[in-house]
């Protein structure tokens, strides 16, 4: 990694593996910037849905992505670090949790022109004192020179249960079986797509979180960060 660039921790993995929660906690603890790259795609999808745009139109969606006005923030919530996502200054965090929005994001993420449009935007989040980047190709493509790369995984069943618990009180009509089917479908699509498939970086540390709590994963990630960055991290 260039010594002129701020440090980066990448946390990749499939949906429901815990990468978002752990990433937010690390960013909050270190006072670093946070990037939820998956949210960028969901933001493009949400914006397209709000504007009734054709998700298969490469030119239209690429232009939307290129001009997307999005911001991330991490604040202290009732259960620790809590992320806030803004689209054109509107807090759309709750709107992004729907599976319809997630499906739109996965669909447009397969369009190379959209990925190119968002690549520069993602890299612009790399500012001092550092960045925690959560996604699917942070360690393989966006920040391939990151000093610490973590890849979280878990069984589809466990990830579906976690997502169900997140959504059941916030989204009406949600069912565990439907979430599991959608997760399995997204896994298949994400792992087999031609552009940036969901795979660990060759130098990533892989953590299976199936039998781990969020606190367990956070503790392990903190240990890895302290070993990697040493004096660069606040006490």
Per-range role (PLM):
Residues 20:
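Walker A/P-loop
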Residues 16-17:
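ATP-binding Walker
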Residues 11:
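Hydrophobic anchor at the beta1->P-loop junction of P-loop NTPases
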Residues 28-97:
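N-terminal phosphate/diphosphate-binding loop that engages ATP/GTP or pyrophosphate donors
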Residues 93-170:
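ATP-dependent NMP and nucleoside kinases share a basic, alpha-helical "lid"
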Residues 122-128, 136-141, 145, 170-220:
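Small-molecule kinase domains that catalyze NTP-dependent phosphoryl transfer to phosphate-bearing small molecules
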Residues 38, 89, 118, 132, ...:
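Residue-level signal for inorganic ion chemistry
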């Amino acid at each position: 990694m260039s010594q002129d660039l701020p440090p980066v921790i990448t946390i990749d993995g499939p949906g429901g593996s815990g990468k978002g929660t752990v990433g937010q906690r690390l960013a909050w603890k270190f006072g670093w910037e946070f990037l939820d790259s998956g949210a960028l795609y969901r933001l493009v999808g949400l914006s397209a849905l709000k504007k009734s745009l054709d998700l298969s139109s490469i030119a239209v969606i690429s232009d939307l992505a290129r001009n997307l006005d999005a911001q991330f923030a991490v604040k202290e919530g009732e259960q620790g670090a809590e992320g806030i996502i803004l689209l054109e200054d509107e807090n759309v965090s709750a709107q992004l949790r729907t599976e319809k929005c997630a499906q739109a994001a996965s669909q447009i993420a397969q369009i190379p022109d959209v990925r190119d449009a968002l690549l520069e935007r993602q890299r612009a989040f790399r500012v001092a004192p550092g960045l925690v980047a959560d996604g699917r190709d942070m360690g393989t493509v966006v920040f391939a020179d990151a000093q610490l790369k973590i890849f979280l995984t878990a069984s589809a069943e466990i990830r579906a249960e976690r997502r169900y618990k997140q959504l059941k009180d916030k989204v009406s009509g949600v069912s565990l079986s439907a979430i599991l089917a959608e997760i399995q479908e997204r896994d298949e699509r994400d792992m087999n797509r031609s552009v940036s498939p969901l795979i660990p970086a060759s130098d990533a540390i892989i953590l299976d979180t199936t039998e781990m709590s969020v606190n367990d994963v956070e503790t392990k990630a903190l240990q890895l960060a302290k070993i990697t960055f040493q004096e660069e991290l606040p006490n």
